[in-house]
Every structure is written in C-alpha cells, then in structure tokens.
Amino acid sequence: MINTKVLINAFFAMAAFTTAVFAEGTWTLEDCLKQAKKSSLKLESAKLREQSADISVKQAKSSGGPTVSASIQNTLYDHPFVYNEDHYRLNLGISGSYTLWDGGATSLNVESKTLTKEATALATQQTERSVQESVLNAYMSLLAASENLRTADASVELAQAEFDHYGKLYEAGSITKKDLTQSQSNLLQKQTSQLTAQLSVSTAKTTLRQLLELDDNVEFQITAPETNIESPDSLEALPTYEQLKADAQNAHPGLKSDSVSVRAAQKNTEVAGKGNSITVTLGANSSTGLQAWQSKAYKDQLKYGWQNSITLGINIPIIDGGATASKVLQAQVSETESQVSLKEDLKTLENNLEKLYLNAMSADMQWKAAILQVQAESEALVVAEEQRNAGALTYTDFLTQKNNLEKAQITLTNAKYTSLLSRKLLELYQGKLD
C-alpha cells in the first residue's frame, strides 16, 4: 500500500502550492482596483453625468448675464394696386438686454445647480465603491476557485498514482478486481471534479476580466499575499460594530450625495417660488436700414436712418393660471423624495453593515472550525490506512475517508476566502480602500 502520511503530505503540499513566478501581466488586488477605476464603463457613465452637471452650472451662471444679438433683415415687397413694381428693404440692427432683478431666481438656480454638481460627484464616488465591491467579490472568488483547482489537481494526481499502484498489486494477485475497479472509479470522479474546478476558475476569471474591461484574448494571472494566510488569528482584530458604523457613515459617498441632493431640492423649491416675482430688464437697441429697389441715396439712408434706443421693462405677474403654484408643488414633492431617499439609504447602509459584520465574525469562526476539521480528517485518514492495511476496513470505507479529507480541504478554502472577502468589504465601507 502507498504510505498514507506521504499521501497526506503530498496532498497538502500541492493544495497549498502557489506559483511564485507568474507570467507577464500578473495582477494584485490593488492593480485590479486601479484598472477598474480607470476603465469601468459604469464609472465612465457616472463621469459623463458629472460633466453634464458642470455644463448645467455654467448655463445657470450665464443666464444671469447680458445677451446681445445682431439682425439682418431683407424684405422684397410690392403694392399691386398702387405701384406696378417691386421694392426692396434692408434693416440692420443690434440689440442687447440685461436682467436687473428677477427676485433672486438666477442666483438660487446657480446655487441649486452647483449643489447638484456636488451631489453628482459624490454619486460618482459611490459608483466607484460599487465597482470596487464587485471587483473584490470577483477577485476573491477567483482566488478561492484557483486554490480549489489546485486541490482538485492534487487529488487527481494522487488518485492516478493509487490506481497505477493498485494495477500492479492486482497483477500480483494482492487485491481483488473490485478494489481495482473502485480505484478506477475514484480516479474518474476526481477527474470530473477537476473539470468542474477548471470551469469555476474560467468563470471567475471571465467575470473579473469583464469588470476590468480587458479584451477576451488577454491572458492574466492574479497574485495575492492572502493565499499564504493560514488562520484568522494572524489577521488584525475586527473593529467594534459601533466604530465600523461611525466610520462607514462618515465615509459613505452615497449618503453625502443624498444629503447634498436634499439641499439642492430645497433650492429648487425656492426657485419655483420665484415664478411670480417682479422682473426688471434693461434693454438697448441700435438699428438702421434702407429701402427702394433703385436709389442713389443708400449711404444717406443708412446714415440718417440710424436709430438708438434704451428701454427699462418691468414685468409684474398677476395671473399665471396656477403655473407657479404647480411648479412649487412639484419641487416640494422632489424635495420630499430626496429626504425619503436619504433615510432609506441610511437604513440600507445600517442593514448591510450589520449583516456584513456578522458575516465577518461568522466567517472567522467557520475558518477556525474548518482548520480543526481538516486536522481531524487527516488523523482519521491515518487511522483508516492502518485499519485498511490490517484488513479491518474495506476499500470503499477507505475512499470515503479520503473524500472526507478532500471535502474538508475545500470547505477550509471557501471559509478562508469568505472571511478575507468580508474583511476587505469592511475596509471598503470604512473608506480604507479609496
């Protein structure tokens, strides 16, 4: 029989093996987060919304400035019942206007648009957080899948070695045909598990590649010091929930964006109320022209026809059919919606933090339990080997014990990366990955 201690040592050596030298294009977690910030389509869309908000601010500011326009009007006309000929008229002019007073609507609108721009910038930061969270999930999933694949590869190699060894024993008449067939069946099952593990790695890598917006023909590997962590005891202690909650609320761009949006909505309500305000406008105009189809006095017409004017207009709204009242009501509804959104997002954050914190604590305990389970299954396999050699244990029971060890190793891997992911997400919510 193959020495079981040697098998166990080889199994763990291969399962824990991490390639030291990767091909060109190796990515750390920090590299992935930077690439996602640079290339994410979601972030690109958010930045475009920022640009749109910036343009709105500029438009709001320019609306309070003077306007100047020039005009050139060419007219061809006739009097069919008076003169039997066509006449030509040319009018030239330049005019300008400036709003002296609009009840403060323009300045309020500028303030509102500025706040909206600030809220949009914070919303972009929240989108960045969301992208980072997706990258973290994909990155840790790929690490876990890769480690499970190494476990599956080790299992296949050991099962192949055992099958080859059993083939020799069968030829020597030391084991039965049944034992050899079971060994072959075990090898096929391990190869099937290996294919499943390969598919998981491929799926996880595709997910991460798409988040990083890399071409599908780009080959890349990931590397992380997390693969060498053996126990949660070697990690920093989790913060208290109160500290986590305080840090997360202070560092959450989404809450800040909602808070600024509420202020912007309040300004919009004030702007809507200015619809019935008196408006004072200063205007100026300068114009000239000429007429007649044929004339030698074009120059004189332009000269003596020149006219300048200045006007002061005062608009006093009296009845607007309820338009201003409707705009105020709509603005108040939007303001209330912004306040409700802020409260809902705050509750959502609290719920997410509570779940995430409990998951992190639970994952640490599951990780420790999985370590003990692997140790227990390893000892059980040593005993099973001794019983098998003594003829007190069937090969089927021996295979069951080997499979239990492999399952325990997979459980350990999943628990490990679940814990690491939970901790990274806590850091993300605390703003430590910005």
Which residues does each predicted region cover?
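Small/polar, glycine/serine/threonine/aspartate-rich low-complexity segments that form flexible
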Residues: E24, S71-Y98, N109, E226-E236, ...
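Periplasmic alpha-helical coiled-coil/stalk elements that build and connect Gram-negative outer-membrane
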Residues: S130-D247, N359, A363, L405, ...
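Bacterial Sec-pathway N-terminal export signals of envelope proteins
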Residues: F22-S69, D216, I222-R263, L346, ...
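Acidic, low-complexity, intrinsically disordered peripheral segments
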Residues: E30, D216, Q409-D434
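Bacterial N-terminal signal peptides that target proteins for export
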Residues: M1-F11
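N-terminal signal peptide c-region/cleavage motif recognized by signal peptidases
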Residues: T18-A20
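Sec/SRP-type N-terminal targeting helices
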Residues: E44-L48, K61-G65, S69, D86, ...
